[in-house]
Every structure is written in structure tokens, then in C-alpha cells.
Amino acid sequence: MSEDTNKNENVDNIPDNFDDNVSFTKLNEDVKDELALAKESLMRATADFENIKKRLEREKGEAVKFANESFARDLLPVIDALEIASNLQSGDDEIANKIKDGINLTIEQFKKCFEKYGIKEIRTDAEFNPEFHNAINYIESDEVESGKIAAVYQKGYLYNDRVLRPSMVVIAK
């Protein structure tokens, strides 16, 4: 009989608010679903943050890489003037020849400095390329193949592989 008594006690132990336990289970499932959504939202926000961080680092690197671009562009007329002075005919005048030698040394120093900071002269010994060359005229030529650069009026330069100034050229027909 003691077994029957235990069974009756277990039945008596079922709470009157058994339906509340069922609703608690439902509430627990709802909370778990909301937690899963919150975790997913956090993961997306974290991924977005990481992407923004990477983009800002990339943009910062680009800004640093091209920070001196306007300064470099401002130096181009200086080297142009020096090259024009270097090409002037000085004849047999010893002083003029020494000045010309000094100008040539200055040009070489400029070119070394340019190279050090990623400034390169645009090649003009090949076919015309509108990405790097600006055609200012066309001429008939038996010496130069059609579509090739026949003459250079102004040198062009690249800064870290970006066009700083296009070459001003004449194209052969």
C-alpha cells in the first residue's frame, strides 16, 4: 500500500497551474528564438564593422600614397624649365657651358628624387596611348609609322602609376 500512496502523492504534486508551465515552455522557446536573432544581428554588425574598418584602412593607405601628388605636380614646370635651358645652344662660351653642365646636374638630381618618390616619366617611344598621351597635332611623316608618336612637346609623368600629367605629343599619320 505504500506504493499506492506514493503514486497518489505524485499525482497530487502536479501543480494546479500546469498550463502555466506549458506557457513558460513557449516563452522559453520565444526567448531562445530572440536570442538567436540577436546573435545573428550581432554577427552581421561585426562583419559590417570589419568591412568598414578594412575600407578605411585601404582609403587611408591610398591617401598616404598620393599625399604628395599636388606637390609633385607643382614641381613639373620647374624641371620643364631646366630641360629647356639645358637644350639651349651655348656655342663655345666656356661660362655658358659650365652653367649648362650645372643645369644638367640639377636635372639629374631632380630625376633621382622623382624616382625615389615614385614619379616616372611617361614613355613616348611607342604607339600613341590616350591614357598617357595627349595628341595636340598630327603630321604626315615618312620617317615615323602611322599612329606612332612623331614628336614630344611636353613630357608627361606618372606618380605611383597614376597619370600626374599626360605627355603632349604629335602623332604621325
From Swiss-Prot:
It comes from the Bacteria. Its main location: cytoplasm. One of its GO terms (cellular component) is cytosol. Pfam families: GrpE. One of its GO terms (molecular function) is adenyl-nucleotide exchange factor activity. The keyword Cytoplasm applies. Keywords: Chaperone, Cytoplasm, Stress response. PROSITE patterns: GRPE. It is found in: Cytoplasm. The keyword Ligase does not apply. Transmembrane segments: none annotated. One of its GO terms (biological process) is protein folding. Homodimer. Participates actively in the response to hyperosmotic and heat shock by preventing the aggregation of stress-denatured proteins, in association with DnaK and GrpE. It is the nucleotide exchange factor for DnaK and may function as a thermosensor. Unfolded proteins bind initially to DnaJ; upon interaction with the DnaJ-bound protein, DnaK hydrolyzes its bound ATP, resulting in the formation of a stable complex. GrpE releases ADP from DnaK; ATP binding to DnaK triggers the release of the substrate protein, thus completing the reaction cycle. Belongs to the GrpE family. PANTHER family: GRPE PROTEIN (PTHR21237), GRPE PROTEIN HOMOLOG, MITOCHONDRIAL (PTHR21237:SF23). This is Protein GrpE. It comes from Campylobacter fetus subsp. fetus (strain 82-40).
